Amino acid sequence: MDETVLWQLSYGMYAIGAKHGAEDKGCIVNTIVQITAENPIIAVSMNKDNYTYEVIRESGQFAVSILGEEVDNNVIAELGFSSGRTKEKFKLFAAGHTKEGLPIVEQGAVGYLTCEVLQMVDAETHAVILARVVDAQKGDAKTPMTYAYYHEVKGGRTPKNASVFSSDELEADAKAKSEAPAAAGSGGAKKMRVGWKCPICGYIEYADELPPDY
C-alpha cells in the first residue's frame, strides 16, 4: 500500500483546551470534522496517550481554538511538543478562557468552539471524540492554518502522537531543508542558506545570525 496517498487528505491546526481542577491543559490536533449542521456535532481525533485525552474523558468538555496562519510558533511548540502532566502549557503564551472557564489561544485564532462530549469511539491508538458545539465565537485571525501551511510555510514538524505522524516523512523533510541551497549567485556558484531550527517545534528561521528572541 502506498501510504503517501494519505498525505493528500486535508487537515487543519487546532488547539484543544480542557480543565483539570483549577489547571489548564491542552494539546494540538490536526483532525476535526463537522458532522451535523443543526445542533452541530464535531468529531475530533486524539491520541489516547495524550494527557489532554484523559482530562477530557474525566471532565466531559473542552474548547477548540481554530489556529490562524498568524499564530505564534511558540503556541504550537508548547501545546504540541510537551506534556501537560508536569506543567500548565497555557501559562507560557497569551491565553484566555471561554465563559465556561476553558482555556483558549487568545491571539492568532480564527475562532473558538466550546464543546460537550457525547461519545468517545475507540480507534486503536486514537479515540474519535464526538462532541456537541454549545458555543462559538470569532477570534482575531483571518485565515485558518492548514496542516500543509504549517509544514511548507512555517517549517513545522509533526508531533509523534498526531494522527498523521510519519517518521519517514519527517526524515525526508529535514534532509531536504538541510540540503536546500539558495539561488545561484554571481558566476553561477551556489550559496548555501543558513537556517536555525527550533528543536521543539521544528520551525526553521533562515538568517545569517540567530535572532535574539529566537
Please identify what each model-predicted range represents.
Residues 1-193, 205:
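Basic, polyanion-binding surface patches
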Residues 198-201, 214:
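Short cysteine-rich clusters marking metal-coordination/redox-active sites
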Residues 207-214:
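Short linker/helix segments within small regulatory modules
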Residues 192-195, 210:
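Processing junctions and N-termini across compartments
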